[in-house]
């Protein structure tokens, strides 16, 4: 699902280790870090150096969701730092991959692991929380969760982006405080949003990011900054 809860066609990469016939493998869901080009999405980059492929060489069945906004869903804004759609991309891929394994006769040993780095660390924690809240059958197989270097404190992450904008635009940057932007006009709000997004996205990015993570921070919407 996207940030509005609407169903979208999503994609990802499944990497299967070479083992003797009938051998069973643990399942590892790997959530990738922040990327800015669709060609870097796992399903578009199935090469030997891709992290998920390397992990599969260690004996895991590795699932690597592209995330909404990449792969089959390119064109849909990527829900960066929005926990619900981020978690859904991982949990839905877990379910789809389980169905595929049954159809392809790829045996797993009933063990599930979650890991991710950078944005993938955030997505991993969001997915773990979603599994706990739903009581999903995947939770019964979950053995370990290892998130790494993620922007778990979204407030702090956004404060870092604000500092980058303040360095570039000190006058406008002085006005950027959570909750204060509501008192500015629409043009000022759009400019602040543009500057914050530019601080994150490189100029050659070929995907779009949903700006709600910025809007919620600027609105001081603590309930959703998580």
What are these regions, as identified by a protein language model?
Residues 15, 30-34, 65-68, 115-119, ...:
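Active-site-proximal beta-strand/loop segments in catalytic clefts of secreted hydrolases
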Residues 80-103:
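Alpha/beta-hydrolase active-site loop
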């Amino acid at each position: 699902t996207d940030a509005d809860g609407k169903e979208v066609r999503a994609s990802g990469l499944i990497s299967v280790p070479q083992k003797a016939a009938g051998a069973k493998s643990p399942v590892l869901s790997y959530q990738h870090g922040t990327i800015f080009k669709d060609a870097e999405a796992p399903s578009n980059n199935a090469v030997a150096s891709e992290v998920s492929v390397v992990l599969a060489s260690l004996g895991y069945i590795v699932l690597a969701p592209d995330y909404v906004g990449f792969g089959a869903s390119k064109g849909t804004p990527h829900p960066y730092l929005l926990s619900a759609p981020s978690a859904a991309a991982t949990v839905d891929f877990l379910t789809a991959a389980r169905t595929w394994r049954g159809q392809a006769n790829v045996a797993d040993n009933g063990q599930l692991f979650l890991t991710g780095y950078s944005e993938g660390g955030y997505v991993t924690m969001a997915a773990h929380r979603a599994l706990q809240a739903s009581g999903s059958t995947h939770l019964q197989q979950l053995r370990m969760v290892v998130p790494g270097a993620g922007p778990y404190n979204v407030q702090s992450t956004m404060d870092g982006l604000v500092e980058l904008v303040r360095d570039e635009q000190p006058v406008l940057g002085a006005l950027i405080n959570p909750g204060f932007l509501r008192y500015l006009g629409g043009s000022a709000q759009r400019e602040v949003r543009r500057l914050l997004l530019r601080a994150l996205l490189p100029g050659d990015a070929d995907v779009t990011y949903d700006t709600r993570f910025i809007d919620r921070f600027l609105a001081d919407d603590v309930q959703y900054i998580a």
